[in-house]
Amino acid sequence: MTEIYNNKIAIEINTNDIYLDVETAIPIGIIITELVSNSFKHAFNGNNLGNIKIVIKTKQNKYKMILQDNGVGFPETPSKKVTVGLELVSILVLQINGKLKHRNKHGSIYNISF
């Protein structure tokens, strides 16, 4: 499923049917919202042109979520606004007993396993 916002930013969602308990679903929803919001605010340098992709896969009650954009990548010295949002993401990942990895490769890529 791909949604296009302002005719310039496309969000593609690729997932199987997944079923989460509320203690996991709420943090995952907040994590996705925060990371997509960060992409909208910081990844595209104000030109509002880009792609955001969200992939959630499941195998044997384990989940892997990848959120990536094709923006400028994560800055070496992030602003306080960015770090506050990512700190929230880190806390929520710990809350669901997950692991978070981030890297820059043609944009930002966040891998979350839980």
Regions found by a protein language model. Give the residues of each.
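Short beta-to-alpha transition helix within the HATPase_c
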Residues: M1-E3, N7, K57
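Conserved short strand/loop->alpha-helix "switch" segment adjacent to the catalytic nucleotide/phosphoryl-transfer site
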Residues: Y5-V36, F40-G50, K80
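Short beta-strand/loop element within the Bergerat-fold HATPase_c
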Residues: L49-N61
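Glycine-rich nucleotide-binding loop
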Residues: N51, G73, K105-N111
